[in-house]
Amino acid sequence: MEAFQELRKPSARLECDHCSFRGTDYENVQIHMGTIHPEFCDEMDAGGLGKMIFYQKSAKLFHCHKCFFTSKMYSNVYYHITSKHASPDKWNDKPKNQLNKETDPVKSPPLPEHQKIPCNSAEPKSIPALSMETQKLGSVLSPESPKPTPLTPLEPQKPGSVVSPELQTPLPSPEPSKPASVSSPEPPKSVPVCESQKLAPVPSPEPQKPAPVSPESVKATLSNPKPQKQSHFPETLGPPSASSPESPVLAASPEPWGPSPAASPESRKSARTTSPEPRKPSPSESPEPWKPFPAVSPEPRRPAPAVSPGSWKPGPPGSPRPWKSNPSASSGPWKPAKPAPSVSPGPWKPIPSVSPGPWKPTPSVSSASWKSSSVSPSSWKSPPASPESWKSGPPELRKTAPTLSPEHWKAVPPVSPELRKPGPPLSPEIRSPAGSPELRKPSGSPDLWKLSPDQRKTSPASLDFPESQKSSRGGSPDLWKSSFFIEPQKPVFPETRKPGPSGPSESPKAASDIWKPVLSIDTEPRKPALFPEPAKTAPPASPEARKRALFPEPRKHALFPELPKSALFSESQKAVELGDELQIDAIDDQKCDILVQEELLASPKKLLEDTLFPSSKKLKKDNQESSDAELSSSEYIKTDLDAMDIKGQESSSDQEQVDVESIDFSKENKMDMTSPEQSRNVLQFTEEKEAFISEEEIAKYMKRGKGKYYCKICCCRAMKKGAVLHHLVNKHNVHSPYKCTICGKAFLLESLLKNHVAAHGQSLLKCPRCNFESNFPRGFKKHLTHCQSRHNEEANKKLMEALEPPLEEQQI
């Protein structure tokens, strides 16, 4: 109706708003305004259809807001809108129809769920209702949709498991099918979910025996995604149904989980505001399934994990696939942590109140379900068995988790103690190896809370890690390490992490020792800790050994301040990554020891020089002075002959763009000797300045104009930046800031120095056809092409010579 009114209104006004033009009809005025006053296009009511035309000033183009139609002529877009986007009545009808179509399916699915829900206790009813809203709208959330929507599966699962498969099967049919039609992007997911749900019901009669379901399901998870979904569903079914006597527990757990997936309050709000499309619950069900899986099967673990990313290890171990969606998952658990304190006190209160209960009951349930589903070696081995998924996932997971973590840690500490404590009683089998609450506290929690939030992130991770580590039988540790390595965020963590795993197995004292002298830890204590623990951790241990191998190097330098420590670690981590590749085969303790020693002896010097060289100015200065002295004695002798060339260079250096690598430090020293007047007249440097002038300082002597650079000191002609830099070095005695500590060559740019230093590390490149050797791949490549062509010419000559004599003989 509004559109109709708008149509009528303009018909009354036939004058242009911006000039004295008067048109014969509304369309005439519209086209005049769009053509003559395009800048007001955005405010115009195009054809009575609203602000449909957008004018792009930079390109002088008119765009239709409803589609991608674009034209330079306003009239074209105007007619396009009136014809394609139709009269307002059609336009108004369309949205209504679409809305009806979209909302119907949304409404209908909830009904099945509520119908099911009546079968459950009253508590579940309300929860599903809540979750349904969050779901409906939540699933729409773009990235987060998986998080909110996961609620759906919980609900269906819960009712399903408690109620019976019959109810569940109806759910899949109406719910996913309609969403499938509605939700455009994720219909495929919804369909799989249907299948998975239909599959799940099959286990669901027996899911009450979570144990049988979970191991198979976990193995299934490895087999392929759909089975995974099935596997998770069974698992969710399993534990919930197992704890079905405690339906409140379930009610509590799914509810918190609800918010947790919807975790961030904003997401839930937006979730609600979002369109009905959310009925991607069915799609969401795919990620969610395994969320319940963590929510329930790892429940014992989850108390503690709730506090730390560790929990997410447990979850994923259950199935590699979770890693794919794990970012959502991880944030899920993280967010529960958040909701606990702030976001949804409602949901979370149930959990704490229930927490001692659920955690214990679930253990009672879980002792079975745990032993069978999570602990059963088959299930656990299989999940970790796919390290690829782990490795692929962790980075993302880590990214999400760490980002959230600082806040969470702040909020969580209160939660953690409760959760932690319930945790240990939960599954004694798993927890006890972890070192019992006391052990874990000394090893991690108290110290950790003292540590910076960052360290808390990981150390809690490490704390939970012991549990999940042992339960996941070594798959997790290395993966964790790898995941930590993948991100630079955790400079100091690797170490804190290491102590974490080792601490639990050792006495609390040992753990605390490890925490305090992180840097001075001997490799032995950790090795015994890690190697004996899970035999499978041996490979992980080797990465740790590697870490240690490189950490000792930082120790040498990092013994001074602690700030360098983090920097060094980050760098040593890079090195560690290299080390990881090189040392993958080193699994045994002895090999690790040997590697540690070797690396301590050999690599620290190079690595630290290479990686730390640009960052540590002190080192540079010292090296500089010593190298100056050495060079002045040794290289002047060698380069007497070069002096003449250098003098020649001085005169022509303005025009020539000398290759950066060709300027030897010795030559520069020579230059200093040969052109003292210039240096006096132009710039007086202290030794320190000579030793270290940054690129920015060099830029002070250079001005830019019209894309070229000029020397500010003299009036040389405009040149490229590199040429001016060389002019400054050669003519005006401005020292190159970056010098190679190995050979003394100086470079104007840090990147060039890095390349040069890297070349030192490489073995000499030798030409197969002649005696040419080079450290520099670029020059060597040039030589090869040259040598090859020369070689080909020679070969051709020989061939010709060989062919010529027979011809001569024939002529004779």
UniProtKB/Swiss-Prot annotation:
Skewed-composition ranges (Polar residues): 220-233
Annotated disulfide bonds: none
GO molecular function: zinc ion binding
Region (Mediates localization to the spindle and the kinetochore and is required for the attachment of spindle microtubules to the kinetochore): 451-590
Keyword check for Nucleus: yes
UniProt subcellular location: Nucleus; Chromosome; Chromosome, Centromere, Kinetochore; Cytoplasm, Cytoskeleton, Spindle
Post-translational modification: Phosphorylated by CDK1. Mitotic phosphorylation is required for the attachment of spindle microtubules to the kinetochore.
Chain residue ranges for the region called Disordered: 86-124, 136-546
Biased composition (Pro residues): 202-213, 284-297, 336-361
GO biological process: attachment of mitotic spindle microtubules to kinetochore; protein localization to kinetochore; protein localization to microtubule; sister chromatid biorientation
Modified residues (N-acetylmethionine): M1
Phosphoserine modification, residue list: 87, 108, 173, 184, 204, 214, 217, 244, 247, 253, 264, 275, 282, 286, 297, 308, 319, 344, 355, 376, 382, 386, 405, 416, 427, 432, 436, 443, 445, 452, 459, 462, 472, 476, 507, 512, 542, 572, 603, 615, 626-627, 632, 651-653, 675, 736
Keyword Heme applies: no
N6-acetyllysine modifications at: K490
Zinc finger (C2H2-type): 738-760
Crosslinked residue numbers (Glycyl lysine isopeptide (Lys-Gly) (interchain with G-Cter in SUMO2)): K490, K565, K606, K638, K670, K689
Residues with Phosphothreonine modification: T403, T458
Function: Required for proper alignment of chromosomes at metaphase and their accurate segregation during mitosis. Involved in the maintenance of spindle microtubules attachment to the kinetochore during sister chromatid biorientation. May recruit CENPE and CENPF to the kinetochore.
Family matches, as PANTHER family: CHROMOSOME ALIGNMENT-MAINTAINING PHOSPHOPROTEIN 1
The protein's name in its UniProt record: Chromosome alignment-maintaining phosphoprotein 1
